[in-house]
């Protein structure tokens, strides 16, 4: 595994946390000191909000930082049907027994992973409420169905991504949610950085990458 795993179903086996470790360093070209800011947040056990447009490198940045910090990365792609049980866990029938299966958030809290909630604004508001006690100094995860409250281990880190340009009356983050996170701003990289990224990812020379980007920018109407 080289880029972490996206969690779509609850995972209950704690030994499976190693499946979320990133084996090879993902390439990332730092732009505005974001590596240092994220490192400070991780050391201080602070949650982080990555703000920026779609396609500006937020997900690759999280993968890069998970590798640098040596922590597992559990990615959850948020959507309007995502429930609190999808994140926390649920009881499932297994043979003749009913067993509890941890969700990705619970697994990360117990095992010290970075849990990345991608495009958090897509999730229902009643779902995002469960991250509030995790995103302040309590660092607690209530599991109502089990009558338990779990305290996050030191290496657990909560990261969310948010596109400020994608807002409506129905879809936006509450201020009470935003203010709990250290915000790191992202934007599309400058041409020289973008050329380096394309050259590395496509395995072409810098000159070829620059020519490719000219074509793309012309097509998108970007300067």
Regions found by a protein language model. Give the residues of each.
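C-terminal regulatory/interaction module of P-loop NTP-utilizing enzymes
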Residues: 1-223
